[in-house]
Amino acid sequence: MDLIKAVESQQMRKDLTPFNVGDTIRVHYKVIEGDRERIQPFEGIVIKKSGSGLRETFTVRRVSYGVGVERTFPLHSPRIEKIEVIRRGKVRRAKLYYLRKRVGKAATKIKELM
């Protein structure tokens, strides 16, 4: 095992819930405003997972007041408090960019995994 992989493996988090593209998740993210620190939940559909190891990221999309909001999180960030899987989704694509073109209820409609 080379030196970079050894250092990365120490910093990777093992306490996170596994999830896939198409799942509806709630990410509890630590936000620091001045000297205060609070936890801000962000709920939406996972439209993309990319990278591997310590550099792995995922993008969550939700529609808020008719406007699509996407947020990309580093998976192994210490600012992520926890990840809750609300619904498991069944999709046949690795990237769900087609949801960006949809409006209304169709933007959040994904088959549920039983």
Curated annotation (Swiss-Prot):
Pfam families: Ribosomal_L19. Keywords: Ribonucleoprotein, Ribosomal protein. InterPro entries: Ribosomal_bL19 (IPR001857), Ribosomal_bL19_CS (IPR018257), Ribosomal_bL19_sf (IPR038657), Translation_prot_SH3-like_sf (IPR008991). One of its GO terms (biological process) is translation. GO terms for molecular function: structural constituent of ribosome. One of its GO terms (cellular component) is cytosolic large ribosomal subunit. This protein is located at the 30S-50S ribosomal subunit interface and may play a role in the structure and function of the aminoacyl-tRNA binding site. Belongs to the bacterial ribosomal protein bL19 family. NCBIfam families: rplS_bact. This is Large ribosomal subunit protein bL19. The gene is rplS.
